[in-house]
């Protein structure tokens, strides 16, 4: 007997004789089948001109292992939108994780390198296989709490490095710290490096002891990226304004020998075995479910400039559990704001056509996101939740317009919660102006409003809560932002002053953007050279008004004291700034332009 997986119903709405067509999906039923059915109904004309098409997710967990794809054929219309909704707001989850099961005690061989004091509390289990491959991860969650990987010191603590040797591509640390590493070939230890306004995650290649020093080298390509790129690099022995002498800091992670605190874990390779130090009484088997993420993305909207995806609303959906493993393959060295360096180096002779004083070049990539959108128009998110994510939350990459993220909640996000717009990635040198021939290539008329963003940059400290790059007519308003390791809300990219050529000015991509009525607090918790609100480049007609900014972080391992409530970084110009509330007048300016209007 065949059973229908998806139920389709016609139900009356109190909307001027309009009908709603509803496709209901229960947990365990395939989400992609629901969207295919909706696509076919539109193709065959089964939906009236004024009918709303609802795809309703029943309460519970809807697990996926590959991203749900939406294409132009999935589009609605202004009169007949497609609404993807939870049966009850926040109670239906699109989830990229699965529960770890089969916990057992480790064998003698598996205990190799584990500290003896940890062994009575240690449990192991096999990572699941998905599509024929063992799941590799850098994230685990227990009852919604991100579990820390095994580390030399707690992950909110760091230790000062002794030297940063660019010639030999080495970082020097006290030898006593490196003796902890087990040299077990089934584990890949790595180093977290704190460097000015960013971090680097570097896989360790070799440790050479030299008296009281440990000289550490790293795998490629991150070794080349870390030691060749000039900004930002670690500092050694800098003197602060208050007379303190500081050096950049580090931590060691990912080795079985570092398992010494309850809740810590590590994964071996290539068998994927998960090692976990029980926090339960008496070191008992973990009683609360531990989730391993298996999906890198949950939703991918694939439109284009010529054929956008449009008129779709996600309403009340909870998005949870994505995996981020890029550093396991190539390390992670960022330029700024969580954008990874692909190649960067100092110029022997400074100068590029658009800036004679520029002394470096850099090409960057883009971090992954749980929900990624290309060519979207009127694709909106309302009352959604984005939690327990390996990297970013929502990313409007390019060619998107009139999209809203409204009344949403973001918490425990590995990198940036909301990304919008072009950031000069790929083959576009990141300092070179982005001047698209068509304004439609930009993200414009975008809104992020009334959202609550808490605890971002959990994996990459250099990320911000909300970041809009080359955008126009974009509003970020009435959001509550807290728990940022670096800056809170960022607007602009490129380090670009107003162009002198009229043709370039007509095509200028950043203008008429507004940061209004946001409440940002508890920012700069780990990295400085930051602001609660942070801007770059010339943006005529833009404003920063009516924001409440407070509680800047101390960043105990920062090597500079550049932390501001509003940071107008290089070439910021064209803004009106007024009526912002902050404990003290602390606005940083770095080579700002002549067209600023700042009122106390």
Located regions from the model:
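Sec-dependent N-terminal signal peptides
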Residues: 4-14
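Boundary at the C-terminal end of the N-terminal hydrophobic targeting segment
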Residues: 18-20
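Extracellular polysaccharide-degrading/modifying enzymes targeting complex plant/algal/animal polysaccharides
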Residues: 25-375, 380, 426-437
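The right-handed parallel beta-helix/beta-solenoid scaffold, focusing on the short coil/turn
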Residues: 51-53, 60, 66, 80-82, ...
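Extracellular beta-strand solenoid repeats
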Residues: 56, 63, 69, 83-85, ...
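Short glycine/acidic-rich loop motifs that flank beta-strands on beta-rich extracellular proteins
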Residues: 66-67, 296, 323-329, 368, ...
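Extracellular beta-rich repeat passengers
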Residues: 145, 153-154, 321, 325, ...
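Right-handed parallel beta-helix
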Residues: 310-321, 357, 377-391, 400-415, ...
């Amino acid at each position: 007997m065949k059973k229908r997986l998806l139920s389709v119903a016609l139900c009356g709405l109190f909307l001027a004789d309009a009908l709603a067509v509803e496709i209901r999906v229960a947990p365990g039923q395939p989400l992609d089948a629901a969207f295919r059915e909706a696509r076919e109904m539109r193709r065959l004309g089964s939906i009236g001109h004024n009918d709303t098409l609802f795809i309703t997710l029943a309460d519970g967990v809807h697990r996926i292992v590959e991203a749900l794809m939406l294409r132009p054929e999935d589009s609605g219309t202004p009169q007949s939108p497609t609404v993807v909704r939870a049966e009850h707001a926040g109670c239906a989850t699109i989830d990229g994780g699965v529960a770890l099961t089969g916990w057992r005690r480790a064998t003698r061989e598996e205990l190799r390198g584990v500290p003896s004091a940890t062994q009575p509390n240690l449990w192991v289990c096999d990572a699941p296989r998905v599509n024929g491959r063992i799941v590799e991860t850098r994230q685990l969650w227990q009852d919604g709490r991100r579990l820390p990987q095994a580390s030399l010191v707690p992950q909110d603590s760091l230790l000062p490095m002794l030297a940063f040797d660019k010639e030999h591509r080495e970082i020097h640390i006290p030898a006593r710290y490196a003796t902890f590493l087990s040299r077990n070939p089934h584990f890949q230890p790595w180093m977290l490096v704190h460097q000015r306004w960013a971090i680097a995650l570097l896989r360790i290649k070799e440790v050479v002891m030299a008296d009281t020093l440990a000289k550490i080298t790293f795998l490629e390509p991150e070794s080349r990226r870390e030691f060749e790129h000039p900004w930002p690099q670690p500092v050694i022995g800098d003197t602060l304004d208050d007379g303190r002498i500081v050096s950049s800091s580090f931590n060691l992670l990912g080795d079985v020998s570092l398992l010494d605190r309850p809740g810590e874990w590590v994964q071996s390779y290539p068998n994927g075995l998960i090692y976990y130090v029980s926090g339960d009484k008496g070191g008992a088997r973990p009683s609360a479910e531990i989730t391993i993420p298996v999906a890198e993305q949950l939703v991918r909207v694939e439109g284009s400039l010529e054929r956008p995806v449009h008129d779709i609303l996600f309403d009340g959906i909870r998005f949870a559990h994505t995996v981020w493993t890029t550093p396991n393959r190539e390390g992670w060295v960022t330029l700024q704001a969580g954008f990874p360096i692909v190649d960067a180096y100092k110029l022997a002779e400074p100068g590029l056509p658009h800036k004679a004083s520029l002394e470096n070049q850099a090409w960057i990539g883009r971090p992954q996101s749980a929900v990624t959108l290309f060519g979207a128009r009127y694709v909106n998110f309302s009352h959604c939740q984005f939690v327990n994510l390996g990297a970013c939350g929502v990313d409007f990459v390019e060619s998107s317009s009139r999209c809203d993220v409204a009344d949403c909640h973001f918490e425990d996000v590995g990198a940036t919660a909301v990304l919008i717009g072009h950031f000069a990635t790929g083959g576009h040198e990141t300092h070179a102006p982005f001047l698209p021939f068509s304004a439609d290539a930009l993200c414009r008329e975008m809104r992020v409003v009334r959202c609550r963003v808490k605890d971002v940059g959990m994996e990459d400290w250099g990320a911000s809560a909300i970041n809009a790059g080359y955008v126009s007519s974009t509003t970020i308003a009435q959001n509550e932002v807290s728990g940022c390791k670096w800056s809170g809300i960022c607007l602009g990219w490129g380090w670009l002053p107003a162009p002198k050529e009229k043709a370039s000015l007509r095509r200028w991509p950043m203008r008429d953007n507004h940061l209004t009525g946001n409440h940002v607090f508890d920012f700069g918790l780990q990295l400085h050279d930051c602001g609660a609100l942070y801007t770059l480049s010339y943006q005529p007609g833009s404003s920063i008004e009516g924001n409440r900014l407070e509680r800047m972080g101390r960043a105990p391992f920062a090597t500079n004291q550049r932390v501001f409530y509003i940071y107008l970084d290089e070439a910021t110009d064209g803004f009106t700034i007024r009526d912002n509330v902050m404990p003290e007048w602390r606005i940083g300016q770095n080579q700002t332009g002549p067209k600023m209007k700042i009122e106390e």
